[in-house]
């Protein structure tokens, strides 16, 4: 597997020099400075690529080309938005960026309710607290008929939680949910997010999935033409938020996506932390079933609680059998390498706890330096161990 590291460009407090010191050889980045709704200029792509290569690294994955809401709604503005997306994709491919990760989450991107939750090791982790999210949706945002989307017992707990919140706690919860996490959706206000949610009225899961599959039929031929492998990122968390449909959450969703356009360029980002936030997703089985179409891997672990709340655990702890997932991907790599079909799958340590003096530094939520480097070291140890075992198996065969 190719070790990579997410970097948010020149505004990232972590420098490319420090990225190189982690042992990663690839960079995962995007042109976050360019406004959504604008195709990325070829010269800006070339500038970013040159900057990365000057640091002795490679631009291995673009994460992500922004996905305009009109594409997800399939409205009258969608064709122009898809054309802009295709222009950016084409320019990335012609510049030599081999993988593009993207997502299809409506309105909000990856979402957490607490960005500084104390883990058992006293570091700080990201957490999604179900009662807090429902408290925001029902009692702070006051979305129409929001309570109908949740179990009555959960709404009752959320009401109790809301009654205990100070105004400052309510404001912090709102910022955590809608203020825009790194690489995700733009900063929203209470009014703007309510309007965006309302713009999806009447769009159910079947319609949303149809819009995604129509998008794929437009963009995959471009990806094939310029040699880019696409990897759709799962919904995070993989269940409905604000009553909105989410269509990249389960193995059945993946099968629909991959069968819509049968091409190695139409693949997935296997994010174990996102898929793992649903207890009914068997991550090892998914890694085995979809291995040939895994074009990018995010290796992260979560612990899911009885009510669906979850927190980001250490990379080798939590609910995911990380060793089993990595073994499945390494077996796929060796099989396809022998057949000459592709090179190593890029992977990155997805998120990390705030540890040591990172706790007091400016960091992008989830994207600490020490925590991710710790995770990368642990994952590297697993990879090296499994690779040696696979070599022994081959030698004995």
UniProtKB/Swiss-Prot annotation:
EC code: 4.2.1.8
The keyword Manganese is annotated on this UniProt entry: yes
Reaction equations catalysed: D-mannonate = 2-dehydro-3-deoxy-D-gluconate + H2O
Top-rank EC class of the record's enzyme: lyase
Keywords: Iron, Lyase, Manganese
GO biological-process terms attached to the record: D-glucuronate catabolic process
Sample GO molecular function, one term: ferrous iron binding
Listed cofactors: Fe(2+); Mn(2+)
Pathway note: Carbohydrate metabolism; pentose and glucuronate interconversion
Protein family: Belongs to the mannonate dehydratase family.
UniProt xrefs under PANTHER family: MANNONATE DEHYDRATASE
Function per UniProt: Catalyzes the dehydration of D-mannonate.
Name assigned to this protein: Mannonate dehydratase 2
Source organism phylogeny: Bacteria, Pseudomonadati, Pseudomonadota, Alphaproteobacteria, Hyphomicrobiales
Name of the gene encoding the protein in the UniProt record: uxuA2
């Amino acid at each position: 597997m190719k070790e990579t590291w997410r970097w948010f460009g020149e505004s990232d407090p972590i420098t490319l020099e420090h990225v190189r010191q982690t042992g990663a050889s690839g960079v995962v980045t995007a042109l976050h400075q360019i406004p959504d709704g604008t195709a990325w200029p070829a010269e800006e792509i070339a500038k970013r690529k040159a900057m990365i290569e000057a640091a002795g690294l490679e631009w291995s994955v673009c994460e992500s080309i922004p996905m305009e809401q009109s594409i997800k709604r399939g409205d009258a503005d969608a064709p122009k938005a898809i054309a802009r997306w295709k222009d950016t994709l084409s320019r990335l491919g012609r510049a030599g960026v081999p993988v593009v990760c993207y997502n299809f989450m409506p309105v909000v991107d990856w979402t957490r309710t607490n960005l500084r939750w104390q883990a058992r090791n006293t570091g700080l982790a990201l957490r999604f607290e179900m009662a807090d999210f429902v408290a925001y949706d029902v009692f702070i945002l006051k979305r129409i008929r929001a309570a109908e989307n949740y179990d009555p017992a959960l709404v009752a707990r959320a009401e109790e939680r809301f009654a205990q919140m100070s105004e400052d706690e309510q404001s912090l919860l709102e910022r955590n949910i809608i203020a825009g996490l790194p690489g995700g959706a733009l900063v929203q206000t209470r009014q703007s997010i309510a309007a965006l949610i309302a713009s999806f009225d009447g769009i159910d899961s079947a319609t949303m999935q149809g819009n995604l599959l129509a998008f794929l039929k437009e963009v995959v031929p471009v990806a094939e033409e310029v040699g880019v492998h696409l990897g759709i990122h799962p919904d995070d968390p993989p269940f409905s938020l604000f009553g909105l449909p989410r269509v990249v959450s389960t193995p059945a969703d993946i099968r629909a996506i991959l069968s819509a356009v049968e091409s190695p360029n139409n693949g997935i980002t296997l994010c174990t932390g996102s898929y793992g936030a649903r207890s009914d997703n068997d991550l090892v089985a998914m890694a085995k079933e979809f291995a040939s179409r895994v074009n990018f891997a995010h290796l992260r672990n979560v612990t899911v609680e009885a009510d669906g709340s979850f927190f980001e655990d250490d990379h080798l702890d939590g609910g995911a059998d990380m060793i089993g997932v990595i073994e499945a991907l390494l077996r796929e790599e060796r099989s396809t390498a022998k057949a000459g079909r592709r090179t190593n799958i890029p992977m990155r340590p997805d998120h990390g706890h705030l540890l040591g003096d990172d706790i007091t530094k400016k960091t992008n939520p989830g994207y600490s330096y020490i925590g991710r480097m710790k995770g990368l070291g642990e994952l590297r140890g697993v990879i090296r161990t499994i690779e040696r075992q696979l070599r022994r198996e081959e030698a004995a065969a």
